Amino acid sequence: MNVHIIGGGNLGASIAIGIAKFTEGNQVTVTRRNTKSILHLEQLGVTVSTDNKHNIQEADIIILTIKPYQVDTVLAEILPVIANKTIASAVSGLSIENLQNKIGATHQAVRIMPNIASQFGASATCIAFQESNKEAAQKVVTLFEGLGTAPIIDEKLMDAATVLAASGTAFALRYIRASMQAGIEIGFDWQTALAISAQTVKGAAEMLLEEKTHPEQLIDRVTTPQGCTIAGLNEMELHGFSSSLIRGIKTSLKQIKG
């Protein structure tokens, strides 16, 4: 497939890298007003351009990774030169209905929420679409399944998916940073503490994904009566570990909804 990404910021570039590294037979073009920061993508075979219309007529999927205020300007630029395209939008707050109205009935709107782990083939990309666009949306699902997982969700949960899957990357990194800081306090240099903390989180996630079980069941395997693990867990909960994370996620969602 030919994939055209408009918006070569962190997210757009991450998607391009992921497609280049983890999928086969796909040609990628990325556009950005200033391409200096994404020229390195050319080393992966990605075409880089300042022109949003460059190669767009050959595109099977057009991905929008731009700011909400840029949508109308970008669409006014590209719509006159394209026909019957699948347009996948990662624009926060832009509903499928709104996008479909903007692009017209000859195009198919799909809503996506990837994250920057796309470049490592480890994104959780939530996807929503109208039933009438199911066939076109399947192309998008197949593409993003190559960059991690691509669960199909109800569009009403897309704002929540933004927080859980996209903002969630930052929340997970904040936990790793805190674990690293604790590692330094108990004797490790920061590099070793970071390596141990990151690998431990990766291992925990792999166990969950492979065994498809509840986290508490895996926690039970690690904890022993009167052991150090349960003592640490209880101390963290005493100071609001779980509740503070839940509050943070809910606060982020409120920010999106205004």
Protein language model features and the residues they cover:
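Non-catalytic terminal and connector segments of soluble metabolic enzymes
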Residues: 4-6, 23, 48-50, 55-58, ...
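Short pre-catalytic strand/loop immediately N-terminal to key active-site residues, enriched for Gly-Thr
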Residues: 109, 158-163, 215-219
